[in-house]
């Protein structure tokens, strides 16, 4: 236990929480420009071609963002919005593309869980 005098001279250092999404700078989302749109394969034991984009953010960070949903319209120079949220079977992918925002279209055929994919309510 430190004495009062020791604490006066050198106070206790606060605990620093490490963030899982450093490129967001404590913001809920960030805008960026796609520098490369490609597919990559997941870790074992999964098998697929996952759609991802390399994104240059407005704060200068360059990150990899996952493009969720079936089909997308992204290409190089598309302006997109990214949010936090990693993809467990893709190493190094810590961000998700927000569907239905900026240049990224929503998933057109979506009927359930539409809000996560930027899909409008279908005309019944």
From Swiss-Prot:
Biological source species: Shewanella sp. (strain W3-18-1)
UniProt keyword annotation of Zinc-finger present: no
Domain of life: Bacteria
Sites of 3-methylthioaspartic acid modification: 89
Subunit note: Part of the 30S ribosomal subunit. Contacts proteins S8 and S17. May interact with IF1 in the 30S initiation complex.
Pfam families from the UniProt entry: Ribosom_S12_S23
Keywords for this protein: Methylation, Ribonucleoprotein, Ribosomal protein, RNA-binding, rRNA-binding, tRNA-binding
The protein's name in its UniProt record: Small ribosomal subunit protein uS12
Gene Ontology terms: biological process: translation
Family membership: Belongs to the universal ribosomal protein uS12 family.
């Amino acid at each position: 236990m430190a004495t009062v005098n020791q604490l006066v001279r050198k106070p206790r250092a606060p605990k620093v929480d490490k963030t899982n999404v450093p490129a967001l700078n404590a913001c809920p989302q960030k805008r960026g420009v796609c520098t490369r749109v490609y597919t990559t394969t997941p870790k074992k034991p999964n098998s697929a071609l996952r759609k991802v984009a390399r994104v240059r953010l407005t704060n200068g960070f360059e990150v990899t963002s996952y493009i969720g949903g079936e089909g997308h319209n992204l290409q190089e120079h598309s302006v997109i919005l990214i949010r936090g949220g990693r993809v467990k079977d893709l190493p190094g992918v810590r961000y998700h593309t927000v569907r239905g925002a900026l240049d990224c279209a929503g998933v057109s055929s979506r009927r359930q869980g539409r809000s996560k994919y930027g899909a409008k309510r279908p005309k019944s």
